[in-house]
């Protein structure tokens, strides 16, 4: 994994608890640099890995349709992680409050999260970093060229930005390693999400129902992509 894909956003001494990946933007078990980085770091220190997703009561006008689609996909993530000996936890509330509480309660050793340019995620991250006293890493698991290395300044337009991306592609185009079955089990608690109860915590528009013509989950997403590339 390219070292420029990761940055340390809080420097502290690591604790002895599990390494925690706060999954947010990149909701998948496969081809996820943030998850792979967390596992590599955990293997280095012989520690367990846990993945936590914080379900917020409302998000930028999302309705039952969007939340239902997302949660069905996360069910698939939970199952895939269990096969790799990694516990998945679904917690509810605002990340700025709930993530630090989880970190303290379970003596988390270090925190890893995926990068998002949205202001709301940056505000959550800032609040969390201020409250925790463990190392915190941010990994760009979304872009081929990490956002913070793409350009040192605000670009005028695509015509000035595109050449920089093209020059950086050979450096960052690399194959994903396979997520391994994690060798260290977290014996304290096994994650088991209560999906129905979590849905009841949402403060969203319930009048927009889920659709049945589009299937959620990373497996179907990969199948759709392969079909598109083939045809």
Predicted regions and their residues:
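Trp/Phe/Arg-rich N-terminal binding region typifying the photolyase-homology
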Residues: 1-176, 180
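Glycine/tryptophan-enriched, flexible segments
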Residues: 154-231
